Structures are given as structure tokens and as C-alpha cells.
Amino acid sequence: MMATALQRLGRKRAVVLHGREGLDEAGLGDSTDMMVVGQEPHTLDPQTWGLTPAPVTALAGGDVGENAAILQNVLQGRGTSAQRDVVALNSGIALWTAERVDNIGAGIALAQDILASGAAWDKLQALIRLSRVQGETN
């Protein structure tokens, strides 16, 4: 239904995901149902791209401070394997959807490289600095 609505809105490429673990994103513990505008439904299996299966409980966060620490660790190329893999999987899908890569596997590989290098953390820090400067000028 959502994919049909996106198609009617004229979206060239859009993706709707439903992780079978009850997630609104791709997960690592089970397959993910994926609808791409104008295509037949797909089923994604994270193991296809060499990602290690992990239950949704492996992704549990906590309070604001703990979640911020998890985000920092993942964006700096640290964090648990499950945390890094789920971010790479969903980022890879997003990169493919945005037509930055030719396929989801290439998107996952690019996301893994960006995370491992710490470039994702550097980008977030640049965005924070820009936001502060903009806040000071307004």
C-alpha cells in the first residue's frame, strides 16, 4: 500500500521495508520484506551479503546517554558487530535507493568502509559545528 502511494506520488525509486522481527527497517535476525516502487516484492536475507545473523535483542539500547554512546561507537567504526552490521545494511539499502551505488551489496560495502574509517563520525561532527554556527547567527 505504501509503495503504491509512493509510486502515485511520482517517486522514481522508493523502498518500503518490514523486518520480519517486527522492525520498520532491515534486521539481522530474520528476512526483511522489501517493496520497491514499480517492482515485485523482494525478500532480503542479510546473510546474502556476509552479515552475521543477530537477534533484535543484540540491538537494544538504553537511556539517552547509552544510546548516544552506541551511536558514537558505531559511527567511529566501533560498537558491536550487530550494531555495525545493521547500520551498514540499512545504509546500503538507502545508498542504493538514492542511486549512489548500483546494488545493495555495493551500498553495504561502501557503508562499512565509511563506518570503519570514522568518516561518518567526522560528518556528524561537521554537521554539529555547522548547526551551532547557524544557531549563533540567528
Identify the meaning behind each predicted range:
Residues 1-138:
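Glycine-rich anion-binding loops and their surrounding alpha/beta cores
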